[in-house]
C-alpha cells in the first residue's frame, strides 16, 4: 500500500512530525510511505493524512487563509493529526476572534490556557488506546472546555481535556513529536487503517 502523509509547513515542529511519521511508516512492511512538507493548497487533496503542528495559532490561521488552504482543509477526505495550535484550529469554537477555525472537531477550545512560556510543563498522562501513560510536553498549551456528542475524549488532566478524537481526526493540546514516543502517531495511523 502506498501512503502519503503531509505536514503543514507554515510554522511549528515540522521536521519533528516528519521524522515521527516516517519512523512509524518504516515499521510497517506492507506500506511504502512518504512524508512531505505541505506549503500549497494544491498538495493537500493527494494526501492520505496531514498533520497541523503547533506554533502560534493566530499566525497559522492567518497563513492558512493567505495560502487559500482553509476550504481545502475543511473538505479534506483524509485524517488530520493536530497538535497544540493545530488543536485550536480544528475546533468549532475558539474564544479568539483572530482565529478562523476549521470546525472539524466539535469542541470548544481555550487557546493558551496555560498562558506564558514559564507555565509550560511535562506530565505522564493516561491516554485512551495506549497501554501505558504518555509523557506529554505542554508548551503554552490549549485546553478543551467542552466536546460535542461526535467527539471522543482520549485524555484529560486537572485543567481540562487535552486529547480528542472525532472520525478520522485527532487533536492533542501537547507535543507528542517532542516526547520521543511514537505511540500517538501510530494510534492516529491505526485509526485510518494504515497500520
UniProtKB/Swiss-Prot annotation:
Pfam families listed in its UniProt record: SNO (PF01174)
Binding sites annotated in the UniProt record for L-glutamine: 55-57, 111, 139-140
Domain of life where this protein originates: Archaea
GO molecular-function term, one example from the UniProt record: pyridoxal 5'-phosphate synthase (glutamine hydrolysing) activity
Family matches, as CDD domains: GATase1_PB
UniProt-listed PROSITE patterns: PDXT_SNO_1, PDXT_SNO_2
Pathway: Cofactor biosynthesis; pyridoxal 5'-phosphate biosynthesis
Keyword Lyase in record: yes
Reactions catalysed, as given in the entry: aldehydo-D-ribose 5-phosphate + D-glyceraldehyde 3-phosphate + L-glutamine = pyridoxal 5'-phosphate + L-glutamate + phosphate + 3 H2O + H(+); L-glutamine + H2O = L-glutamate + NH4(+)
Keyword Hydrolase: yes
InterPro entries on file: Class_I_gatase-like, PdxT/SNO, PdxT/SNO_CS
Active site per database record: 84, 175, 177
EC number: 4.3.3.6, 3.5.1.2
GO process annotations (BP): glutamine catabolic process; pyridoxal phosphate biosynthetic process; pyridoxine metabolic process
Keyword terms, alphabetized: Glutamine amidotransferase, Hydrolase, Lyase, Pyridoxal phosphate
Cellular-component GO terms for this entry: cytosol; glutaminase complex
Subunit-structure text: In the presence of PdxS, forms a dodecamer of heterodimers. Only shows activity in the heterodimer.
NCBIfam families on file: PLP_synth_Pdx2
Family: Belongs to the glutaminase PdxT/SNO family.
Function field: Catalyzes the hydrolysis of glutamine to glutamate and ammonia as part of the biosynthesis of pyridoxal 5'-phosphate. The resulting ammonia molecule is channeled to the active site of PdxS.
This protein's name: Pyridoxal 5'-phosphate synthase subunit PdxT
Native species: Methanosphaerula palustris (strain ATCC BAA-1556 / DSM 19958 / E1-9c)
Gene encoding the protein: pdxT
Amino acid at each position: 500500500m502506498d501512503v502519503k502523509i503531509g505536514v503543514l509547513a507554515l510554522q511549528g515542529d515540522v521536521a519533528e512530525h516528519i521524522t515521527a511519521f516516517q519512523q512509524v511508516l518504516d515499521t510497517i512492511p506492507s506500506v511504502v510511505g512518504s512524508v512531505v512538507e505541505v506549503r500549497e493548497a494544491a498538495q493537500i487533496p493527494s494526501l492520505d493524512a496531514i498533520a497541523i503542528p503547533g506554533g502560534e495559532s493566530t499566525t497559522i490561521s492567518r497563513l492558512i487563509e493567505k495560502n487559500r488552504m482553509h476550504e481545502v482543509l475543511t473538505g479534506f477526505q483524509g485524517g488530520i493529526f493536530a497538535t497544540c495550535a493545530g488543536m485550536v484550529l480544528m475546533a468549532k469554537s475558539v474564544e479568539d476572534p483572530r482565529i478562523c477555525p476549521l470546525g472539524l472537531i466539535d469542541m470548544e477550545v481555550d487557546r493558551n490556557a496555560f498562558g506564558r512560556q514559564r507555565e509550560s510543563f511535562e506530565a505522564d498522562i493516561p491516554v485512551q488506546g495506549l497501554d501505558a501513560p504518555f509523557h506529554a510536553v505542554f508548551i503554552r498549551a490549549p485546553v478543551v472546555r467542552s466536546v460535542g456528542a461526535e467527539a471522543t475524549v482520549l485524555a484529560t488532566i486537572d485543567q481540562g481535556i487535552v486529547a480528542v478524537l472525532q472520525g478520522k481526526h485527532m487533536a492533542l493540546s501537547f507535543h507528542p513529536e517532542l516526547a520521543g514516543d511514537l505511540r500517538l502517531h501510530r494510534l492516529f495511523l491505526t485509526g485510518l487503517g494504515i497500520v
